[in-house]
Amino acid sequence: MAYLLKFLDIFRWKKHYGREWGIQKIFMDLIKERMNRIMSKVYIFFADGFEDIEGLTVVDLMRRAGIDIQTVSIKETKEIRTSHGIDLLTDRTFGECDFSDADMLVIPGGMPGTKYLEEYKPLTDLLTDFYQNGGKVAAICAAPGVFERLGFLKGRNATSYPSVMEQLKSARTSLEPVVVDGNVTTSRGLGTAIDFSLSLIGQLEGSAKAEEIAESVVYVRA
């Protein structure tokens, strides 16, 4: 950004000395357009055994919405195997990221994926710091249980997979497909993955964009 501002200063100097205003105006218009198109940045974390649909639905729909969502392996390699035996490569490993540009952090459910995510201290430290500084965090299925144990759900409305609900002792539990309370979003499971994804898109890009994506994939709400 500093480089761009310096470039604009050069153009202003040229204008002051009688050079073409048209070039400056075109350049400034391009910069404004580019700035208006800056994408939200989201990181979603995968461990072996994460639930396929819960994780990849978020990635698919966010990318359709123009959101820069990066898949992150908590292993030393990018190779991940889902809970149903699908092998995939993430965009990055955890160690390759600094997360300073994050607008939202997401963890999917699935077993044993959720257990591995919770056991990875660099991730729980990141989530805690991000949450405490007001960053948006989201979890689905078994993963809200991780948020409970990190203290994110105290006094909040939340939901989760049915068998995990009893773990959310500090929260006001709900049977809604998706629950948003402040900077925390929780959802119930595989069957609510589209609603979950659309809610996250709406929070980042507005309800109109979420509706646009819902229509584009012919999603019919019950």
Predicted regions and their residues:
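Short, Lys/Arg-enriched N-terminal segments with co-localized hydrophobic residues
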Residues: 23-38
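Active-site-adjacent pocket-lining segments in enzyme domains
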Residues: 41-44, 50, 64-73, 92-222
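Short, solvent-exposed amphipathic alpha-helices that sit
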Residues: 57-64
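N-terminal beta-loop-helix "entrance" segment that forms/cooperates
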Residues: 72-91
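Short N-terminal binding/cap micro-motifs at the start of the first secondary-structure element
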Residues: 50-54, 79
